[in-house]
Each structure stands twice: as structure tokens, then as C-alpha cells.
Amino acid sequence: MLFRSTELSPENRGVGLVFQNYALYPHMTVKQNIMFPLENLKGVDKLTKDEMLERSYRVAKLVQIDELMDRKPHELSGGQQQRVAIARALVKMPRVLLLDEPLSNLDARLRLQTREEIKRIQRETNITTVFVTHDQEEAMSISDQIVVMKLGVVQQIGAPQEVYDNPLNLFVAKFLGTPPINVFEGEIKDEDLYIGNEKVLAAKGISDQPVYVGIRPEGFIYNPEGTLHLELSSTEVMGRDVSIVSRHPAAISPIVRSIIDADTVVSPTAENKVAFSLKPHKVFIFNKETEERLYPEVK
């Protein structure tokens, strides 16, 4: 592995690692686990016992476990064990911190709490941090820059909101978003976008072809005069919003989910259909073979 064009052995790379399995030494206390990397420092980096203790307590206080230093791993909760692992990675003052799915062993409440802690720690230490996760919500909430990968190949890099708003391909569009994007089979005819037999949007500049159409749940506007008709299955009240669950024969997934304002009164037709208009900036068109994004001309 090369760092700054210099071949370095693992202990000299300046990388702190935290994995899904925290790999704490069960026979050691929290203090001993955190101090362990410092005991292997050599040469000019070697520390005295007092220096190791001072740095270990400083890092423990940063991750808020300084009152747990005499406990052993089996006496800690999952969230506390995770903080010990982060402290052990930070104690060598790395140039880069790699977190490889560090939250996957925690329950939902602890995941949310620890996610905020990791953001705080990164801000306070200002260490470049690479956070690896399969959870798109974690990726969106914790990162300044997001890298979406598929089978080891980078699909898109950008700020989380930018990637969400402007996916380069269908994989990226489907990966980001809760609820997930709705995907339909569609067709471009005479520079118009059709879903089924309904013309839903203009698609100026795109040649006639079959396409995939991605519509974000918030991209629907309930409109009795709208051009896209869905078969209503149910509605779910979520406080300020209402989630409308419906179906469409051209939809790839079994259900179509749209999010609208809770004040909107939805009145299905006698055939149990609801009609929608679409927000153009929440609709994405993809080549059906390559699944790459197609861009209509903007007037």
C-alpha cells in the first residue's frame, strides 16, 4: 500500500481501523485495550507510560467512556464496546480513520445515537474518515461526500443531496432514498414520456425508445386532472405527510408509494383510481439497456 508515494508497512501507514466486529481483547480492561496500540510504537514515536496513560484518557474522554476505563468488554453494552474500538483506533492519532460497517451490530436506537457520536468525533478530531456501509440512510446522514459503488466499481461521487437529486444511473437512484424510488417501464414517443398509455411528461431531445422511469415518492402531486392514474391500495398517515400505496401495471415493484401533504384530501374514482401530476425534477429517465440516465433538453 502506498501513502504519499512511499511504500509503508502497516504499522507506519497512519490508518486507524474499526470493523463490524470490534475485536476487543476480552481479558484486558478498557484502558488496556485503548493503550495496546501505543505499546507497539517504536523509535521517535515511542511513548513513556505516563504519556500513554494521558493520551488514552484524553481519547476516552473524547468518545465519552472515561468512566469505564477499569471495566472489561463483557461488562459493556454494544454501543460502549463500539466506542472503545473507536478510541483504540484514534489513540495513535491516525491521518485516516477507516470505519468498516461499525454500526451493523447495534440495534436501531443505538445506531442512530452512535451515528451522531461518530459525526461529533470526526468534527472534533478533523481526521479524514472513510465510513463503509450498505445502509443508504447512514451514508446520507453521516457523510460530507458519498461514493456509491457496485461490485467494486464507483458509480457516482458527490455530496449526499446532490447524488440523491441527480443520480447518474438506475442503480444509484434505487440505492438512495427512503421510501425507495418507484421504477416503471416507460417509453419515449415523439419526445414525450409515456407510462403505459398515459403521456406524463415532455422528454424533448430524447429519441424514441423503451426506458425505465424513476419517480421519487415526493415527486407525485395529487391532482384529479393528472395524467398518471394508479390503483389505490391504502393510505398511511405519517403526521405531516400521507403515504399513498398504490399499484400500476407498468411498475417494476409490487407497490407504488407516493408521499403527499397530510392536508390533501384524496378522493379515488369509482374504479378506485387516483390521479397524479409529476414534479419534473423528481422524475428520472434511464436507458433500458445500459440503465444510464437520459437527460431531456431544458427549455
What are these regions (language model features)?
Residues 165-188, 214:
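C-terminal boundary and immediately downstream tail of ABC-type ATPase nucleotide-binding domains
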Residues 10-16, 20, 24-171:
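ABC ATPase nucleotide-binding domains
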Residues 192-299:
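Non-catalytic connector elements of ABC transporters
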Residues 5, 52, 294:
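Short clusters of hydrophobic/aromatic residues that line enzyme substrate/ligand-binding pockets
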Residues 8, 113, 166, 174-175, ...:
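Residues that scaffold the ATP/ADP-binding catalytic core of kinase and kinase-like folds
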Residues 1-2:
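Short, small-residue-biased leader/transition segments that mark boundaries at the very start
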